[in-house]
């Protein structure tokens, strides 16, 4: 719901409805992930009407810090993070619930211009979580790392399983190979909407991110190890799984120094 406001403002800025990014990105065309197979994945939830509601994903990068998308925390709400989560509708016995104490969005983030980039935020938790088999820190890439075209990647999240569908209750995953910047920024793909501080993945018209996946990780295999190379940012307003409109992510390796500075100063 919150990201549709961003989408509406982009339309007013003159973008064609064929190419307007919709920043409310769930896993379409995926399958249920094996329980706790992605232990750095978190559920970001907001409080409303006395209940907590899933709104975005995120990645645990320190025991008391989470990386997510800036558009996920634009609204002044009370947020909490759930780690060790798999099924949102039941208690798995592995969850830990921690309130968000501080939100630090990138200073250049503009909610009215998502295609400018900088869609990244860090959340400081009220206390450190306990690391175990179900809760682990995400591995981040080296600063400046650029994925090769067609690198093996997975998107994970509790987002919608189809355009305008329902949120998933169990964590989903979908194989989304990366798409190089040169291809993704071509006129037959996203054109100038995609910047070199972003990562594209998918675009086969079958599998994609969708509403509810925003802020969550893109896990990519490089040198035999999965690392979180992307933060789910936007999809096409024509639908989540549109051919030649790959899911677009904030490129994590472009913000390593910024994140280190935020954590060190907070």
Curated annotation (Swiss-Prot):
Glycans are attached at residue 87. Pfam families: Trypsin (PF00089). Residues 17-26 form a propeptide. The active site is at residues 71, 119, 214. It is an enzyme of class 3 (hydrolase). One of its GO terms (biological process) is multicellular organism growth. Binds 1 Ca(2+) ion per subunit. InterPro entries: Peptidase_S1_Elastase_sf, Peptidase_S1_PA, Peptidase_S1_PA_chymotrypsin, Peptidase_S1A, Trypsin_dom, TRYPSIN_HIS, TRYPSIN_SER. It catalyses: Hydrolysis of proteins, including elastin. Preferential cleavage: Ala-|-Xaa. Residues 1-16 form the signal peptide. This is Chymotrypsin-like elastase family member 1. The lineage of its organism: Eukaryota, Metazoa, Chordata, Craniata, Vertebrata. The gene is Cela1.
């Amino acid at each position: 719901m919150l990201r549709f406001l961003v989408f509406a403002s982009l339309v007013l800025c003159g973008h064609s409805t064929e190419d307007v990014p919709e920043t409310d990105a769930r896993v379409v065309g995926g399958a249920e992930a094996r329980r706790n197979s992605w232990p750095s994945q978190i559920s970001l939830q907001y409080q409303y009407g006395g209940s907590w509601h899933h709104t975005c994903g995120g990645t645990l990068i320190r025991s008391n810090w989470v990386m997510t998308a800036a558009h996920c925390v634009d609204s002044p709400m009370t947020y909490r993070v759930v780690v060790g989560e798999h099924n949102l509708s039941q208690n798995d016995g592995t969850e830990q619930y921690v309130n968000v104490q501080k939100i630090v969005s990138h200073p250049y983030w503009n909610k009215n211009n998502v295609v400018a980039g900088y869609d990244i935020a860090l959340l400081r938790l009220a206390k450190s979580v306990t690391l175990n088999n179900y809760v682990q820190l995400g591995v981040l890439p080296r600063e400046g790392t650029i994925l090769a075209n067609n690198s093996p990647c997975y998107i994970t999240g509790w987002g919608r399983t189809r355009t305008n569908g329902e949120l998933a209750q169990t964590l989903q995953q979908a194989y989304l190979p990366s798409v190089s910047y040169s291809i993704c920024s071509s006129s037959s793909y996203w054109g100038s909407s995609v910047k070199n501080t972003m990562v594209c993945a998918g675009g086969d018209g079958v599998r994609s991110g969708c509403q509810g996946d925003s802020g969550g990780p893109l896990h990519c295999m490089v040198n035999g190890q999965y690392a979180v190379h992307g933060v789910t940012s936007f999809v096409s307003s024509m639908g989540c799984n549109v051919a030649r409109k790959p899911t677009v992510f904030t490129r994590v390796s472009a913000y390593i120094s910024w994140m280190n500075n935020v954590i060190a100063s907070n």
